[in-house]
């Protein structure tokens, strides 16, 4: 049996009222500028930006369901990061052959199927692992 990586992006649990409020690529334009503009626009319209987002009730049941679906080794490594691109490096470092991704986005890349043209980021890390032959399979939930 090979090694698997379970990767959870917490946006999987966030419901968004307005589809335009999504986040796409990790860079200053989206992470800082875009969200700051959204915040100011909401303030100008006397709206609370927090009202556009809701935490799913599934978050309370998630780990119990995961424990029933997966078998974990006692020596499992757990990593927490502010960027999902860390999963790319973890999969390579631990010679994983399968990724199980829980995410609101597929993380297969949006700009091109030529992964050698781009550095790894939160939106393409899984696509790069597949394209480079690092992993054999990916399950996206």
Regions found by a protein language model. Name each.
Residues 1-141:
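Conserved alpha-helical scaffold segments that buttress catalytic/binding sites
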């Amino acid at each position: 049996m090979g090694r698997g990586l379970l990767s959870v992006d917490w946006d999987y649990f966030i419901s968004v009222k307005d589809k335009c409020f999504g986040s796409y690529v990790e860079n200053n334009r989206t992470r800082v500028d875009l969200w700051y503009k959204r915040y100011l626009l909401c303030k100008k319209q006397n709206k609370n930006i927090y009202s556009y987002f809701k935490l799913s009730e599934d978050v309370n049941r998630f780990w119990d369901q995961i424990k029933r679906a997966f078998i974990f080794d006692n020596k499992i490594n757990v990593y927490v990061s502010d960027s999902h691109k860390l999963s790319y490096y973890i999969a390579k470092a631990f010679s994983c052959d399968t990724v199980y991704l829980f995410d609101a986005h597929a993380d297969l890349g949006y700009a091109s199927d030529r992964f050698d043209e781009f550095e790894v980021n939160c939106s393409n890390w899984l696509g790069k692992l597949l394209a480079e032959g690092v992993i054999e399979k990916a399950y996206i939930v």
